[in-house]
Design a protein with these regions (language model features):
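Helix-turn-helix repeat elements of alpha-solenoid scaffolds
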Residues: 37-45
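Polyanionic, low-complexity intrinsically disordered segments
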Residues: 1-26, 32, 36-37, 58, ...
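Short coil/turn linking the two alpha-helices of tandem helical-hairpin repeats
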Residues: 74-75
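Residue at a conserved register position within TPR or TPR-like alpha-solenoid repeats
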Residues: 70-71, 120
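Amphipathic alpha-helices of TPR/Sel1-like and other helical repeat/solenoid scaffolds
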Residues: 44-52
C-alpha cells in the first residue's frame, strides 16, 4: 500500500456491517484487545477502508478505523489527513452519517479519542511538524465546534486532542522563536588571522668607506 495521501470524495454510505471488507477490518481491530497481542495489519485496514469508501461510501466507523491506521503508519501526517476527513464528514454530513444513533456516534468518536491520543503521545514532535499541527488543530476545532452544536447526551472529548495540538503548536513556536533568536544573537565568526612567518632581516651591510686621499700640502 502506497503511503501517498489518498484523495477521497466524501459520499456517505449506509450500514457497512454486511460488507466483507468491513468485517475484515473489525477482525484486525479486535486484535488490539486480544490477550495474545497479535500484530495488527494496519496497511490492510487502510486498504480495505479505501475500498469501502469507493464502493460503498464513507461511514463514521470505517473513517475512524482508517484514521487510526493512517496515524499508525504515517504518524502526524496520517493523523492530520484523517482528522480532515472526519471534520468534513461530521460538519458537512452529520444528518446523513451511519450510524444514525447519536449515542453510537459519540461512542465511536470517544473510542477514537482514546486510541489515537495514545499514539500521538509517542510521537516526537519537531519544528518541521508545525504546518501539520496547524492543519490538525483546525480540523479538530471544526469537529469540536460541530459536536457542541448537535444534541448529544454525552459529547465525546475531542477537546483533549484539540488541546494536545494547541499546546504542541505553542511549544514548537517557542522552540522556533528561540532558535531564530539564538541564530540572530550568535557572534559573527571571523576567519582566523593569517600570520606570515617572515625571517628576520639580515643586517644591512654597507661598503667600508674608502679613505679620502690626503690633501697635498705644498
Amino acid at each position: 500500500m502506497s503511503d501517498t495521501p489518498q484523495h477521497i470524495i466524501i459520499k456517505t454510505g449506509t450500514d457497512p456491517r454486511n460488507r466483507p471488507e468491513f468485517n475484515a477490518i473489525r477482525e484486525e481491530i479486535n486484535k488490539i484487545n486480544h490477550p495474545a497481542r497479535p500484530e495488527v495489519n494496519w496497511g490492510l485496514i487502510e486498504s480495505l477502508a479505501l475500498t469501502l469508501f469507493r464502493t460503498h461510501g464513507v461511514d463514521l466507523q470505517t473513517a475512524v478505523y482508517y484514521t487510526l491506521a493512517r496515524t499508525q503508519k504515517n504518524g502526524l501526517a496520517g493523523f492530520t489527513e484523517g482528522c480532515e476527513l472526519l471534520a468534513g464528514m461530521v460538519v458537512g454530513q452529520w444528518d446523513h452519517l451511519w450510524p444514525e444513533q447519536p449515542q453510537a456516534r459519540s461512542e465511536i468518536l470517544e473510542w477514537f479519542n482514546t486510541r489515537v491520543s495514545n499514539q500521538l503521545r509517542q510521537h516526537d514532535f519537531t519544528r518541521d511538524d508545525l504546518r501539520l499541527v496547524y492543519r490538525a488543530e483546525r480540523a479538530l476545532q471544526l469537529l469540536y465546534d460541530k459536536l457542541q452544536q448537535v444534541e448529544l447526551k454525552r459529547v465525546p472529548r475531542i477537546e483533549n486532542l484539540l488541546y494536545l495540538m494547541q499546546n504542541t503548536a505553542k511549544k514548537l513556536e517557542s522552540a522556533s522563536d528561540a532558535a531564530k533568536a539564538q541564530q540572530t544573537a550568535a557572534p559573527l565568526k571571523m576567519p582566523p588571522m593569517v600570520y606570515l612567518s617572515v625571517p628576520e632581516a639580515e643586517p644591512v651591510r654597507t661598503a667600508a668607506a674608502a679613505p679620502e686621499p690626503a690633501a697635498n700640502i705644498e
